C-alpha cells in the first residue's frame, strides 16, 4: 500500500505529523482487516518527503514519529527513494534500518553516484536486515512526450530489470495504463 505524499512523518509541524499518524494507522487497520501479514510481506510504503536540515536529524524525527504509530504500521512501514530532494538509495540506507523500496525512475531523476544496478542491489539487501522478505520495488518510465522526466509513461518500452541475478522481487508497475502495461510486460520476451 502506498499512502499519499502528504504523509510526512519527519515534518516539523505537529499537526501534519498527527494527521500522518492518523492516516497511516488507518492504512494499517485496513490491512489488518484484510488479513494481511503484519510484516514486510505486506509493506506500507511512504517517502521521507523532507529535505530541509540535517539528514540524520530528519531520519531520527521520522523514526521517533513512526514509533508513535500503531504496531500495524510499525511492522510494515518501508521508505522509498525519491525523485527530488535528498533521499537517494545511499542516503536512505545510511540513515534508516527499515527496508527501502527502489523506484527506478526516481533513481534516474535523482541519481546518487550509484549505477542503476548498484542502487537496485543496495535496496534489495535492505529487505533482508530482519529476516528474508521479498522486496517490493516500483517500475516506471518517463513519458516520451512530456518535458518533465518525472511524468510517468502510459505503457512500457522495456521490462523491469532483475539485474540478471534472478532476485525474486515484486514490482508495482507505476505506468498510467496499469492493466495494459502489466499485460505488455508479462508478454515481453525476456533476454
Role assignments for model-derived ranges:
Residues 63, 89, 105, 117-120:
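A general structural signal for well-ordered alpha-helical packing
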Residues 98, 110-191:
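Histidine-acidic metal/acid-base catalytic patches
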Amino acid at each position: 500500500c502506498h499512502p499519499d505524499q502528504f504523509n510526512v512523518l519527519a515534518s516539523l509541524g505537529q499537526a501534519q505529523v498527527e494527521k500522518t499518524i492518523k492516516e497511516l494507522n488507518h492504512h494499517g487497520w485496513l490491512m489488518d482487516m484484510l488479513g494481511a501479514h503484519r510484516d514486510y510481506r505486506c509493506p506500507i510504503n511512504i517517502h521521507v518527503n523532507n529535505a530541509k536540515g540535517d539528514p540524520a536529524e530528519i531520519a531520527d524525527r521520522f523514526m521517533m514519529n513512526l514509533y508513535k504509530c500503531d504496531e500495524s504500521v510499525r511492522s510494515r512501514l518501508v521508505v522509498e527513494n525519491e525523485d527530488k530532494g535528498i533521499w537517494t538509495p545511499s542516503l536512505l540506507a545510511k540513515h534508516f534500518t527499515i527496508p527501502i523500496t527502489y523506484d527506478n525512475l526516481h533513481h534516474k531523476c535523482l541519481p546518487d553516484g550509484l549505477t542503476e544496478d548498484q542502487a537496485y542491489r543496495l535496496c534489495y539487501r535492505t529487505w533482508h536486515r530482519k529476516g528474508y522478505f521479498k522486496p517490493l520495488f516500483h517500475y516506471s518510465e518517463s513519458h516520451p512526450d512530456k518535458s518533465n522526466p518525472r511524468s510517468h509513461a502510459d505503457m512500457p518500452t522495456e521490462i523491469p530489470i532483475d539485474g540478471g541475478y534472478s532476485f525474486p522481487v515484486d514490482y508495482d508497475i507505476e505506468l498510467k495504463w496499469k492493466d495494459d502495461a502489466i499485460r505488455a510486460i508479462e508478454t515481453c520476451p525476456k533476454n
